[in-house]
């Protein structure tokens, strides 16, 4: 058989072994001190279900997925691939968290959508529906663009923290009042790359 010219995994392992390097090629991320709340498999299944629901609700129509930076990026990417519709992306950015994990209570718009969404079906994609302050604010911002419809898709819902009365239209998981990270969610910009959603113990939540 002719060679493809591509060095596959077995070739890479052989080279590493020859060098005396026995380190695994893809070492698993260590959740040191963290409690896994939802595994990557549980997340994938639920996101697929959400995508199917959105596809049914907007069958035959176009949608614009508007993600909230930075936390919703991973969720939006996975959700989009589970939606069998003509979909485009855009992004918003806000500032609402202060130092560490403390929320300031004031929401500021750092970035609006780049393209016109007037007359479009918007799905506002967020990582977590928490106090409701950010999503209530962004709902007003997007409503001012005069869309055809506006729905909210949040991977997580933490109703115990709600300050502003608002509910999501598509919710992945309802969680207890614990600080969670992973799958895009962070603590002081850390842990976003964890594939699972994990709980940080209160003792670790010091202001940095």
Write out the residue ranges for each language-model feature.
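PRPP-associated nucleotide enzymes
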Residues: 1-208
